């Protein structure tokens, strides 16, 4: 029977590739890189260095958001959000801090520290859910 006429089989997965490997450390490493760019630029007057640092800071900020979104949309499920009612707000605040209103718009390492703090709060909840699983 041609594949087109074969019966449809419904499958589901919690992510694009159901690997089950999640860790907020990925977001944290990228946020640490953002903070390092901010700190190093403060000590350097070379315009080429600053341009490279800006590009890296933008890219790493996007990666922070990506890793947070994967956790938010693929790992955490409705029971987690019920048990931790502030979880959606934490993700919203963290992704905004990694965006145009946060690390992308600022060279202040304190903004990166706020982002790292939100990631740490998310990580604490993440590891609690892993223990319960």
Predicted feature residues:
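N-terminal intrinsically disordered, cationic/polar leader segments
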Residues: 1-50, 80, 85-121, 125, ...
């Amino acid at each position: 029977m041609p594949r087109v006429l074969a019966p449809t089989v419904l499958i589901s997965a919690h992510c694009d590739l159901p690997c089950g490997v999640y860790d907020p450390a990925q977001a944290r490493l990228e946020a640490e890189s953002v903070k390092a760019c901010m700190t190093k630029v403060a000590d350097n007057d070379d315009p080429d260095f600053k341009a490279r640092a800006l590009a890296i800071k933008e890219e790493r900020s996007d990666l922070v958001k990506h890793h947070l979104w994967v956790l938010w949309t693929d790992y955490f499920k409705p029971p987690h959000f019920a048990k931790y009612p502030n979880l959606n707000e934490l993700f919203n605040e963290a992704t905004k801090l990694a965006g145009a209103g946060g690390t992308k718009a600022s060279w202040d390492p304190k903004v990166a520290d706020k982002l790292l703090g939100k990631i740490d709060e998310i990580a604490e909840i993440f590891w609690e859910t892993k223990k319960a699983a």
